[in-house]
């Protein structure tokens, strides 16, 4: 039990509410789970779903994918979206932004595109790639409502330098990727 940021009680089973002193807590060294490894939960900053469920889909699929990852130790995640239409990306960014208010394990959105070099698109649909315009950037930032955490951009594209500056000024980490840049 925690009170005012301090451990106030320890125990197991029905005794967990037993009052104790801080000296008892400090002296407690035994941990159940011999042979197990205790670590903080994992944080995934680039994942597209799991268990057949996609972060590109509806809330129930997003929650199902998150449940799969949570059961395996990933306690928090930035949900990645691949390049899609501006309408799809803004709708998903808004959906994920709303979910951050009810699920502390959802940290926000990583936009992997749509401002990528077509020659280095990987699995991205070439029809979904676009130039970075101020209107598109503003729409994505507005939809994300402060929860877009990262975006992948090809810096050589027209409008990319201004786009990068706008995202950085909004507190979004910008990753260089799917690019023809070579140094």
Give names to the regions the model predicted.
Residues 36-88:
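Metal-associated gating/positioning segment near the N- to mid-region
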